[in-house]
């Protein structure tokens, strides 16, 4: 298993993508291949992103679902080294100067993914939003080389038992430097 996405509720769409992809609210990002490796040398940072969309909003057709809020929970043996952030969309009225080149992703005013906020334990996200959870593992010297699972679970925040809505599993490999 490298990357596995399990959708248990009809109104959620999830997609793993690399950390450099800009995930716009109105455009489906390029998916990370199921067999793609998330890896780094020990002491380096390894990153990936999880794009999420509720109600099939913008990523496809969907319908209104009964849940209003979902809790996001991250589990991993390397959790002490894991930094999970939410990428917030911010408005931009001046995206590019009139005289610009081809190096811009977009030129028109709108919402742009820019602001990183720390995702706290059991963070609650609204079904009215779409966005990105960005995961970075700082593979410090204390993190032993090896392959570690990272599981990101979305559960219904309104139910006491927290019905699982979706789950994403990926593997992160920390490589030992070889001389």
For each predicted feature, which ranges?
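Solvent-exposed, conformationally flexible loop/turn segments
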Residues: 40-45, 127-132, 145, 177
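Short, surface-exposed loop/turn segments at beta-strand-coil junctions that are enriched for proline
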Residues: 57, 138-145
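Short coil/turn motifs at secondary-structure junctions
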Residues: 55, 157-159, 177
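An acidic-aromatic substrate-binding cleft motif
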Residues: 163-179
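A short beta-strand micro-motif common to beta-rich folds, especially ectodomain repeats
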Residues: 50, 146-158
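Contiguous beta-strand segments within globular domains
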Residues: 33-60
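Surface-exposed binding patches on compact interaction domains or structured appendages
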Residues: 2-32, 56-135
């Amino acid at each position: 298993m490298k990357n596995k996405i399990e959708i248990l509720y009809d109104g959620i769409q999830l997609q793993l993508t690399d950390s450099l992809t800009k995930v716009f609210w109105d455009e489906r990002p390029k998916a990370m291949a199921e067999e793609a490796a998330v890896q780094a040398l020990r002491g380096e940072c390894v990153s990936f992103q999880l794009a999420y969309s509720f109600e099939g909003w913008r990523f496809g057709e969907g319908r209104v679902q009964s849940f209003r809020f979902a809790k996001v929970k991250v589990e991993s043996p390397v959790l002490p080294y894991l930094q999970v952030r939410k990428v917030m969309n911010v408005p931009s009225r001046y995206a590019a100067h009139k005289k610009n080149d081809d190096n811009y992703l977009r030129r028109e005013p709108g919402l742009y993914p820019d602001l990183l906020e720390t995702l706290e334990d059991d963070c609650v996200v609204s079904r009215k939003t779409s966005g990105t959870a960005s995961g970075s593992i700082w593979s410090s010297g204390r993190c032993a080389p090896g392959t570690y699972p990272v599981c990101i679970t979305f559960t219904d925040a309104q139910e006491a038992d927290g019905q699982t809505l979706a789950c994403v599993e990926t593997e992160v490999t920390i490589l030992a430097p070889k001389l």
